[in-house]
Amino acid sequence: MMMQAKAVQRVFILGMDGAGNFVQQAETPNLDVWLPRGSYTFDAKAEMPTISAECWGSVLHGVQPDKHKLNNEKAATLSYPSDSPFPSLFRLVREQQPEAKLASFSSWSPINSGIIEDNLGVHKVSLPDAELVSSLLVYIEENQDVRLLFLQLDEPDGSGHRYGYGDDCPEYLAAITTCDELIGSVLKRLEKLGLMEDSLVVLLTDHGGGGDNKYSHGSAHPMDRDVFWGCIGPGINSGLLKGPVSITDTAAIAALALGLTLTQQWDARLPEGLLDDTWASKSITIVDNKTAAAEESHNG
């Protein structure tokens, strides 16, 4: 049985696309304040290949790309199979908590149309970054009992493709700064509404860029694969994580906080040192073999 030390009422996964770990070189006054409030790292790993569908698919489905089988073309043209053995967090919540409010705000529309399953009653919005966050802020005001909310901002990746990725590309760094402002507005609204006290927030990006190709990504080069990742909330330690972290691990802490039961072994793991000792148990129940999917260790 999974036990929680403190009740988490809602989970927010807030991401920007293609930022890598260049948030360290960009002006990010909001991340600079918020990341240290929880556990964080600038050395998390994106999945391979370091491409959006593969990576966001792993964030939301808890498994590596060879299992969820997503790529950009599939995500843009096909619905994710509703009977897949590797469901998204959204499908798991809907099946196990039928009345839960679910929302996905994604500037890159294939996340809503091809990575998250159809017909789950998820409130889905796809708009340019600034309009998207405006819509999200209205939604939060009116739906403070939302159970799971995902946000993807796209412009760092767009700027990287147009102007180049890296700390020598001012347009790219400026796009990261803009996304920092937008995510900061979400976090400040959550705090103003008093929602941070019983919410879990993950802050992340899916991949970087500029490794093998200044204007693209997809390789295992550190510029493509090394990314920032952070988690804030009840029972989460504060400070730098010293062990390995994968973006896929996002699903493990979300599932643990949401009280979900899995039917398949996940690749997602709880990063070492993430949870404080107020968590009574550090595992997620798997109904088919009764073993823990997310012990507080990471298998790399």
What are these regions (language model features)?
Residues A5-R10, G20-P98:
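Active-site nucleophile/metal-coordination loop of metallo-enzymes that catalyze phosphate/sulfate
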Residues A7-V11, R37-T41, Q96-A103, Q144-L149, ...:
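Loop/turn elements at helix/coil->beta-strand transitions in domains of secreted/extracellular proteins
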Residues V11-G15, N30-L31, T178-H217, A254:
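Metal-dependent active-site segment of extracytoplasmic phospho-/sulfohydrolases and closely related
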Residues Y80-S135:
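A substrate-binding/cap region within the structured catalytic cores of diverse enzymes
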